[in-house]
Amino acid sequence: MSILIDKETRVLCQGFTGKQGTFHSEQAIEYGTQMVGGVTPGKGGQSHLGLPIFNSVHEAVEETSADATMIFVPAPFCKDSIIEAVDAGVRLVVCITEGIPVLDMLEVKAYLRQHPDVRMIGPNCPGVITPGECKIGIMPGHIHQRGKVGIVSRSGTLTYEAVNQTTQMGFGQSTCVGIGGDPIPGTSFIDVLEMFEKDSQTQAIVMVGEIGGTAEEEAAEFIQSNVKKPVISYIAGVTAPPGKRMGHAGAIIAGGKGTAADKYAALEAAGVFVVKSPAEIGKGVAEATGWSTH
């Protein structure tokens, strides 16, 4: 088992013929992902990377039975692209794009609430991968290894760090989910923690958080009552000054809330094994689980 995606997942790309859409679709195909086509309005009927192009997601789903989509369209058009995918019956929408207006995401969230059977990952995220089976997003496939650690993260590059270390230690990953660095994500830490807790392949969970917002504190509360599996966590931004945005739109300490210290305190109180440096994530997993390494 894994969560969200597996080798049966049929994937579309919205923004298929653009530079990023092309590059990451190529990478996904190379990885073994079942890419079934792409959407670029006005180019329907043509083919690209040996796959059909459609004018709309509805048309693409009808023709290919796609059940997942990765979105590589410019930020101003993402809201419409996401809603179009939801309306077409796609069950998993992965939006990679950064810079979507917060107001647009509020509208998307409200729309998703009316469609509880649809799961959206992102925006501003690296995507999701089940090693050896399916890769939807921008993560480097070669560092992943099929295994037993579920990884969920607000950061892209720190996800790769956690992946690389758990691969080198021989633990591997069940599924890795980048929920994204924006203030309003489609999927929260809690959503993913709940999935990992129920997943038989996942035996330990790595959660990479960062300053800003209260997502980690809420996750800590959830872990305390609902998660029996060992959770290892790292929070980025310990030295970040208040009021300064640190890369991600959501990574800002505002109104005295959202500091790394607050988050670490909440996680430790919930029994989470915390590490204070990204270099310690792999060791943290070994220590928290008692697993022997390579």
UniProtKB/Swiss-Prot annotation:
It holds the Pfam family CoA_binding. The keyword DNA damage does not apply. The active site is at H248 (tele-phosphohistidine intermediate). One of its GO terms (cellular component) is succinate-CoA ligase complex (ADP-forming). CoA binds at T17, G18, K19, Q20, K43, I96, T97, E98. It catalyses: succinate + ATP + CoA = succinyl-CoA + ADP + phosphate; GTP + succinate + CoA = succinyl-CoA + GDP + phosphate. Gene3D superfamilies: NAD(P)-binding Rossmann-like Domain (3.40.50.720), Succinyl-CoA synthetase domains (3.40.50.261). This is Succinate--CoA ligase [ADP-forming] subunit alpha. It comes from Coxiella burnetii (strain RSA 493 / Nine Mile phase I).
